[in-house]
A protein has these predicted regions:
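Short glycine/serine/threonine-rich phosphate/pyrophosphate-binding segments
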Residues: 15-20, 42-43, 66-68
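Active-site-lining helix/loop region of Rossmann-like oxidoreductase modules
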Residues: 57-210
Length: 210
């Protein structure tokens, strides 16, 4: 979902309306806050053109952390970024990619890799599950050069993301274990909180982090 900051109050809109909302923001020169990394990748040319209309498109951190470190490292040279996402089967069983490829996650007893590719491919294959892959790619070496693995792990109760970064300024690892949202097990509770934090940051006179 995304938030269009209107003159009065924000309106929350389904991701399918991303392009129309983005175009309206550009036309009216209004900032856009979103957690839809896949929506940004699908409309990347429009996002790049935001500079021409002096409009800011903000991709909130969502369910991941460490984007400030990735952005800082990208000012130098990043050699590689690998992201490994592991989720309980109930968080992935309704994903379009899983259904289309008839991947069985029932009665799973051991971890099972269900996707391996780039962050671009992963964000488009799992638009409701791994928007964080797009965020990691955009903050760092680029989504086409960011490696991504997605696992279904029956032993987990939380959605887990690990990011491994090698660069000329620092090598670092990021790990987060997100509590599942009751409304959508594929999304972590912290995702909505990241949008609130983003809005507070915009309104605050003090900014922490890159």
């Amino acid at each position: 979902c995304l938030i269009y900051i209107a003159p009065n109050k924000p309106a929350i809109t389904p991701k399918v309306a991303f392009k129309n909302i983005l175009q309206n923001c550009l036309l009216n020169r209004k900032p856009l806050i979103t957690i839809s990394g896949s929506g940004i990748l699908d409309n990347f040319e429009l996002v790049i053109n935001a500079n021409k209309s002096k409009t800011q498109v903000i991709l909130a951190s969502g369910a991941i952390l460490g984007l400030d470190g990735l952005r800082a490292a990208s000012e130098g040279k990043i050699f590689s970024v690998t992201m490994v996402t592991k989720k309980p089967p109930n968080a992935l069983k309704s994903a379009k990619f899983v259904l289309e490829n008839k991947i069985s996650l029932e009665k799973l007893s051991d971890p099972k890799i269900i996707f391996k590719g780039t962050a671009t491919e992963g964000a488009k294959a799992f638009p409701a599950n791994v928007n964080v892959a797009a965020a990691v790619g955009l903050a760092g070496i680029g989504p086409d050069k960011t490696s991504l693995e997605i696992w279904a792990d029956p032993k987990l109760t939380r959605n887990t993301h690990q990011v491994f970064v090698k660069s000329d300024s620092a090598d670092f690892e990021i790990k987060i274990e997100n509590m599942q949202s009751k409304e959508n097990p594929g999304t972590g509770k912290i995702t909505a909180l990241s949008v609130i934090a983003c809005l507070r940051g915009i309104a605050s006179s003090l900014k922490t982090g890159t």
